[in-house]
Amino acid sequence: MPAILDKILRIGEGKILRQLEAIAQAVNAIEDDFVAMSDAELQGMTAEFKERLANGESLDDIMPEAFATVREAARRVIGLRPFDVQVMGAGALHMGNIAEMKTGEGKTLVAVLPSYLNALSGKGVHIVTVNDYLAKFQSEMMGRVHHFLGLTVGVILPEMRPDERRVAYNCDITYGTNNELGFDYLRDNMAGSIEECVQRGHNFAIVDEVDSILIDEARTPLIISGPTQDEVHWYAEFAKVARNLVRDEDYEVDEKKRTISVLEPGITKVEDHLGIENLYESANTPLISFLHNSIKAKELFHNDKEYVVLNGEVLIVDEHTGRMLAGRRYNDGLHQAIEAKEDVQVREEYQTLATVTLQNYFRLYDKLSGMTGTAMTEASEFDKIYKLGVVPIPTNKPMARKDQADLVYRTEEAKYEAVVEDIAERHEKGQPILVGTVSVEKSEHLSAKLKKRGIPHSVLNAKVHADEAKIVALAGHKGAVTVATNMAGRGTDIMLGGSVEFLADAELRKRGLEPAGETADEYQAEWPGTVERIKSQVANEHDEVRALGGLYVVGTERHESRRIDNQLRGRSGRQGDPGESRFYLSLQDELMRLFKSDWVDRVLQVLKIPDDVPIENKRVTSAIANAQGQVESQNFESRKNVLKYDDVMDRQRKVIYAERREVLEGKDLQDQIRTFIDDTVTGYVTGATEEFAEEWDLEALWTALRQIYPVGVDYRVLEEEAGGRANMDRDELIAVLQKDAHEAYDRREAEVGETVMRELERRVVLSVLDRKWREHLYEMDYLREGIYLRAYSQRDPLVEYQREGFEMFAAMMDGIKEESVGFLFNLEVQVEIEEEDEEEEEVLEPMRQPVPSFDQQGAMPQIRAKGLERPSQPTKLAYSAPSEDGDAEVKGATVTNADDEFAGVGRNDRCPCGSGKKFKQCHGRPGGPTGLTARVS
């Protein structure tokens, strides 16, 4: 099926190529006019284009002139004039397609043209690279062209602070990796204020090596995770509290519903134990969950029944099979409460706080395009998932590479012996060689054999990748031997004799000149002369290497994907240079086992063919191609399946993030809160009045409603007015209670003041929304883990996931409404106007776990919660994403107290140092004598 679709998709190629040729011809027709311009006139075109766009012209209208402007600017600034085929590639990108351009055709330069054109709209352009080095290098090298034309260029790097990221995103053109862009999107949707957000939208993205990013890495989502709680010591404290509480006296237990409720005497005991006045004050609300979990752990979970303790670890016991569920933990802090009860180590637990797949992240962009040397084999997937067409751009010069037939050996050892022999023979002549391996282990194995043979070489793999760009750029030198995994070579050309631009840049940097910053002008002035000098040096070696046959590429194993094989071959034969490639295989290779090579091995044994004699057989080659096709189809189905499931989460994510963004941007929440009140009251009344009217339990309904707001009407009065409970009407009851709740809210606002109420609404909604969304992510993960079991009962797991996921989302939204209303009615706040300018304002976020932040300033009067002052605890966030070698990377940022001397001191207490100031104004102040420090763990 994919093959048929590929053929259908290629039918329109001719038409698109004719359109692109017309664009190149239009640019050529006006090129002389731009060549004749002075620098000032050429630079003035940017302002002219922006004015024309403001007057109603479209980007398509100005495209030929904009491309001609960039072509001439690139020639003057970096000495590179885009070829006609590069202009065609630029047109394909602007049209929202994937441009398949062979290795060495100058994709990096191609991206400059459409990025300039689209940046003129003022909405920003993102250029996505496969690693941080390329993002930095390309932003500096190609950024010189944009700077010349008056545009700003930024780059996103891992070590950058939020304020630096914000500046970079506000530039006209921003370079960065897919992981950095994706994580910034997630972090923006965890921010506590609009000022903390760094991205400004998703207008247009150009994805370099688009097949690697949108296909190879598509199955691994971006995940930000953090501890489900960060006050581990509270679990031990509340385990002690629970031991001292008496069942039916201090709390009640409903074993059937597996719930507990704390009674007034129990609350008093807890407050006395902790030394606080009111457990239900806003500052103390996180402690309530610790209390409930500790009592649940005591009464509802028992050793050797619901769990066992083994080697200092609490292991859940499956109630159906009786087996221990290693690695599984109860959520919402319950597992930690059980650990504290059993007096074993309370383990920190990470939970998903935010997640998105790369597929759904890049579908956020209004326009998406990409470049790669190998896209046609995945054209159907690009079309189905991203609605992207693939356009094969002709090469500037005819391909001269010779792709030799595969050589297949019986054993892996025999294969490597043949590879080493071939390398030794070619190396002796001086021909540069690139050897591709499928894993770090295989690259190290081959490296050891080359060392034993005395052949000098460079190794490039996941362990040794610090100098990736340098090694690849110099791999075309005479006599160079480079052993690399398939992570190598992305985005950096292997040029015969060496890379002129790389060598020129390296020399200027060695002299202390940088393409950006204070020395940018001197760097620019020195660039042309340095390039010309190095060109003459490289030219001689280039001709010498050409005479030796160009770059020789050796593949030591077929990859699962034909694209990666083609990518490896494509390192050779750039820009019409000669080159050669060959794959060495063995019947013990992983892919060979996939198509059951036993029959080949048996034939070789019967014929008594020695291990070191290769076979060249079309049937074997065909079988390998079929095996690759099967694996590619399986991987495509896997990615498609991931997307189907994530689409469920994506729809929910967009609803939550859109609501969250509106709150951050200052949306007036009054009407929404009143809708929350109406919905909450309606839900409570509906749930309590499902039976006949005479059976309604109004006492229980009123008890439940009083937990939400101070009910001002008496159900007995309503019952009397209706002439008995049997005559009461549900809709009338809802209307009466809604009116009563609105009046109570009006009184609440009058009590705290309108300004404070608006700020309280914003903070409460944000806090509750974030917490409920985190809990929902956990529940959805749990649902996803076991949903496949529905297939055994003849149910479609995806349909079941969609149905239950929707029900859970609806329940979460109801929970957000109810909890927001409850907090707004019941939080006890104290408003203070600060007298000292330097005093830090506190932010009321009773249950929200924010991204680590050192100083949150605001212009509002303080909303200060009375009661327990808790010492700050470490907050860690872990980031999980696909790395360059396909594994997950995990990073964590930890904020800790620099000095434990003041641990336990309340923020409003006098500082122990004797200054007479409050602790929060002295040693407890961020940036103060012992402030807060950040470290990466």
UniProtKB/Swiss-Prot annotation:
Localization per record: Cell membrane; Cytoplasm
Keywords: ATP-binding, Cell membrane, Cytoplasm, Membrane, Metal-binding, Nucleotide-binding, Protein transport, Translocase, Translocation, Transport, Zinc
EC number of this enzyme: 7.4.2.8
Region (Disordered): 868-889, 915-937
Cofactor binding annotation: May bind 1 zinc ion per subunit.
GO cellular component terms, A-Z: cell envelope Sec protein transport complex; cytosol; plasma membrane
UniProt keyword Acetylation present: no
Domain of life, source organism: Bacteria
Catalyzed reaction equations: ATP + H2O + cellular proteinSide 1 = ADP + phosphate + cellular proteinSide 2
Essential cofactor(s): Zn(2+)
SMART domains per the UniProt record, alphabetical: SecA_DEAD, SecA_PP_bind
Enzyme class, first EC level, given as a word: translocase
Complexes and interactors: Monomer and homodimer. Part of the essential Sec protein translocation apparatus which comprises SecA, SecYEG and auxiliary proteins SecDF. Other proteins may also be involved.
Function: Part of the Sec protein translocase complex. Interacts with the SecYEG preprotein conducting channel. Has a central role in coupling the hydrolysis of ATP to the transfer of proteins into and across the cell membrane, serving as an ATP-driven molecular motor driving the stepwise translocation of polypeptide chains across the membrane.
Protein family membership: Belongs to the SecA family.
PANTHER family: CHLOROPLAST PROTEIN-TRANSPORTING ATPASE, SECA INNER MEMBRANE COMPONENT OF SEC PROTEIN SECRETION SYSTEM
UniProt name for this protein: Protein translocase subunit SecA
Natural source organism: Nocardioides sp. (strain ATCC BAA-499 / JS614)
Gene symbol of the encoding locus: secA
